[in-house]
Regions:
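A domain-level signal for the structural core that forms small-molecule/cofactor-binding pockets
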Residues: 1-67
Length: 67
């Protein structure tokens, strides 16, 4: 049972998340011939203040125009 975990900052629409889940499922199904019903996709969204890159939050990077 393949499990794909995706961590994103908040801000995407339910339709975008649905499309991502469908695309990831299709990619796993095609690439490793996993049965579609066995593929799990877990999307976790977090606040930009809780997601760090190089010790700085995404919120700070966006505010400074560096992200």
């Amino acid at each position: 049972m393949p499990v794909i975990q995706v961590n994103l900052t908040k801000g995407r629409t339910p339709e975008q998340l649905q499309a991502l889940g469908e695309a990831l499922t299709a990619a796993v199904e095609e690439s490793i011939a996993a049965p579609r019903a066995s593929i799990r996709v877990l999307i976790t969204e977090c606040d930009p203040e809780h997601f760090f890159i190089g010790g700085e939050t995404i919120a700070d990077l966006r505010a400074s125009g560096r992200r």
